[in-house]
Regions:
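N-terminal mitochondrial targeting presequence
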Residues: 1-22
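Ligand-binding clefts of soluble mixed alpha/beta catalytic domains
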Residues: 17-558
Length: 558
């Protein structure tokens, strides 16, 4: 079986909105012109299949925790592995969309996944943000990347109003790196209480140690479950208490599950064992009666007319090679139907309406560099989608805005600013998938990470940066030559060539999708063939919160 891009999830098909009746389909069907027999298609398919296999291998690596030695030690202590805890918490045959699964990959001092499992799954019929300490890696100690990932999961829970379930077994902060953790780590406690204040439930299941600052996670959660003879929650363990006060105390009397359940009241439920804790977690979610705040109009959900497998042959592995975004849209939206907006104006930005798993979406997809016309078209389209309370889907493959004397005089800056203004102030849910290049201000205009999309995923061919390595090295070459001319000095061609090669190599490394995802610039690299499934889950999660557009915008320069 092909390893799916959603790093680790239940084997289930996600159907999206429940079809209640067969509606008429007024949108036209996209007519694909792809020839699977062409040499170009076959070359793309071969390269993209290899990239997908590389991704699958990286995702498998991220599921092994601390490795066989520490996993066996964990099992020998009669404990469930962290991923088993997630599996048993989820509804039977449900899904788990793992988020940021490769955070920390190839970053010195870190492991893939950043010692924290996190994602979205259904528990007692309710979509929840689920996190679990990877307790087989340094006892689940939190690094600075663990904190970043935890913060990102909290952002997703808040923006989409999803209940959160934290499964804790952690040695706390990775003390040798405390200077990188202490200040940002405190934000997690603040956000936990803020979600509670906004009536977004927070649940904590404690399977082992949760000490020092980590004790505030169960202390500040709405509901806390502790496992008998395993959970240990205290601000200071026995050695530190002895050193600070001279008092002798044992782990159980100081912070054991029974003490907190019977005496301190920090624990709300005492679980007999780990499976009982998971049962109690499911029971808590069941009694919440949590409901979605929005729902699309019921409609028949039809799969695309073209196979997702085609995406491997359509999309160029080299970002310099263009491809038609409509061919991508045709393979992810319902029945391959798409109502295009202003098709003859600003043609390098494809805009239009479709449905995906029954959810309405307004799609903005790059079909070339952004000109003034395409920027104006995109801004107007975003205004229309906000007027209709329609979520936005950005398919980003952009090298930036057009430059040059003519375009500057035509006002490319002010027109680009209109699009960025619209993206910045839009209030409907936005989801971004980077299906190719993401350079310069094009990243901003197409709702990059800094513009707070609800979710942001990338494909393995993705590249990101201020500009490409060759372009940046070339710019520096021109600048250095001009500087030498001003000083009246000859150019050292050998030194300049070495410098250019070093800069180009650096930029190429830093624009690699694995470099980006390791640093949480996105929510995960996905196999192109899984795009529809991933977007279905993301849209469903977004509809847990109210879906409301705005008519308030910043000043548009005309």
């Amino acid at each position: 079986m092909r390893a799916v891009a959603v790093a680790w999830r239940r084997r289930a098909r996600y159907h999206g909105a429940v079809p209640l009746r067969v509606d008429e389909q007024p949108y036209p069907v996209i007519a694909s012109v792809i020839d699977p027999r062409s040499e170009t298609y076959r070359a793309h398919e071969q390269a993209n299949r290899a990239a997908a296999e590389k991704l699958a291998a990286a995702l498998r690596e991220a599921t092994v925790g601390g490795g066989d030695k520490y996993n066996q030690r964990h099992l020998a202590a009669c404990k469930l592995l962290p991923r088993q805890r997630v599996e048993l918490l989820l509804d039977r045959d449900s899904y788990f969309l793992e988020l940021c699964p490769l955070a920390g990959k190839d970053v010195p001092g870190h492991v893939p996944g950043a010692s924290l499992i996190g994602g979205i799954g259904r528990v007692s019929g309710v979509e929840c943000v689920i996190s679990a300490s990877e307790s087989t890696v340094k006892g689940g100690a939190m690094s600075e990347l663990s904190v970043w990932k935890s913060t990102r999961l909290a952002e997703i829970a808040e923006a989409n109003r999803l209940p959160s379930i934290s499964m804790i077994e952690s040695a706390g902060a990775d003390l040798p790196n405390q200077s990188k953790i202490f200040v940002p780590g405190g934000r997690g406690f603040r956000e936990l209480t803020r979600r509670s204040a906004e009536r977004v439930p927070t649940i904590c299941l404690v399977f082992g140690s949760s000490t020092a600052g980590g004790a505030y996670i169960p202390g500040m959660s709405d509901y806390t479950v502790m496992v008998k003879q395993q959970a240990q929650v205290y601000l200071a363990g026995p050695p530190l208490v002895k050193m600070a006060t001279g008092e002798d105390s044992g782990h159980e009397e100081l912070g054991g599950a029974e003490m907190h359940s019977q005496i301190s009241g920090v624990s709300d439920y005492l679980a007999e064992d780990e499976r009982d804790a998971l049962r109690l977690g499911r029971e808590i979610v069941a009694h919440l009666g949590y409901r979605k705040a929005a729902a699309p109009l019921p409609r028949q959900v039809l799969p695309p007319r073209y196979p997702a497998e085609d995406l491997l042959g359509i999309v160029a592995p080299d970002i310099k090679t263009p491809f038609d975004a409509r061919e991508v849209i045709a393979r992810i939206v319902d029945d391959s139907r798409f109502s295009e907006f202003k098709p003859s104006f600003g043609s390098t930005l494809v805009c239009g309406w479709a449905h995906l798993a029954g959810f309405p979406v307004g799609i903005l997809a790059n079909n070339g560099i952004l000109f003034s016309e395409s920027a104006q078209k995109g801004a107007q389209f975003i205004e229309l989608c906000n007027q209709q309370d329609t979520p936005l889907l950005f398919l980003q493959n952009i090298t930036g805005f057009m430059v040059g004397k003519r375009y500057e005089q035509e006002g490319i800056i002010k027109h680009g600013a209109k699009l960025i203004n619209a993206v910045s102030n839009s209030t409907v849910p936005a989801i971004t998938v980077m299906i190719g290049a993401s350079f310069g201000a094009g990243n901003y205009a197409m709702c990059g990470r800094a513009y707070a999309p609800r979710f942001l995923f990338t494909w393995p061919n993705h590249r990101i940066g201020v500009m490409g390595g060759k372009q940046l090295a070339g710019v520096l070459d021109i600048i250095q030559r001009e500087a030498a001319a001003k000083r009246g000095e000859p150019v050292d061609e050998q030194r300049l060539a070495v410098g250019k090669a070093m800069v180009e190599g650096q930029i190429d490394r830093e624009s690699d999708p694995y470099f980006a995802t390791a640093r949480l610039w996105d929510d995960g690299i996905i196999d192109p063939r899984d795009t529809r499934t991933v977007l279905s889950i993301a849209l469903s999660a977004a509809y847990t919160a109210p879906v409301r557009g705005t008519t308030s915008w910043g000043v548009f320069r005309h």
